[in-house]
Regions:
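Membrane-embedded catalytic scaffold of the fatty acid hydroxylase/desaturase
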Residues: 1-146, 152, 156-157, 161
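Membrane-proximal intrinsically disordered regions of secretory-pathway and membrane-system proteins
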Residues: 153-176
Length: 177
């Protein structure tokens, strides 16, 4: 950048809360105290407003096509917020229930494991990176399934959409092992 001028950033202002969230979570063992403060916290407020805008626009686009899809857009935004908030208020719950999101924040590669509520899209995109056996979900859908079905699904996933592994050990993963 030029001396005396602000550095140009292609990141929109609204993304500053996202990157601040990532910094906070890395420093506080996956906790995000902004969720404790609630709507008074600028990052939490920005997340809620952003989700509301996206859900409202998507719902409006889907409404003429399908009222069910319109409701699904609203539900998905609310579910995302609930899961994401709970994960960062209860890290132990997150490690057990949504380990892919824990990996997203605490893994050495934060450009992996983008999904929050379910990991299946990361498998399709090839962005699921598992950092420790304790942080591997039962199956790529991220839901509890009977063992035989989960094993079959894991076999299919490994053949067509294999997850990547990293060697970096995480403190929580070591404690869980």
């Amino acid at each position: 950048h030029r001396a005396g001028q602000r550095r140009y950033s292609p990141v929109p202002e609204s993304m500053k809360s996202h990157w601040e969230h990532h910094r906070e979570v890395r420093k506080t063992s996956f906790h995000d105290h902004g969720y404790v403060e609630g709507i008074r916290n600028w990052r939490t407020k920005n997340e809620i407003v952003s989700l509301a805008v996206v859900a409202t626009v998507a719902s409006g686009v889907f409404y003429p096509i399908s009222k069910g899809m319109s409701l699904a857009a609203l539900y998905s935004a609310a579910n995302y917020y609930y899961i994401h908030r709970r994960a960062h208020l209860e890290p132990e719950w997150a490690v057990k229930k949504i380990p892919w999101h824990y990996d997203h924040h605490m893994n050495s590669n934060q450009d992996a494991n983008w999904c929050v509520t379910k990991p299946w899209f990361d498998y399709i995109l090839g962005t699921r990176v598992i950092s420790a056996p304790a942080l591997q979900e039962q199956n790529p859908l991220g839901i509890a399934l009977p063992r035989v079905i989960a094993q079959g699904l894991n076999h299919l996933s490994a053949a067509y959409f294999p997850a990547k592994w990293v060697e970096k050990k995480l403190a929580v993963a070591e404690q869980l092992s």
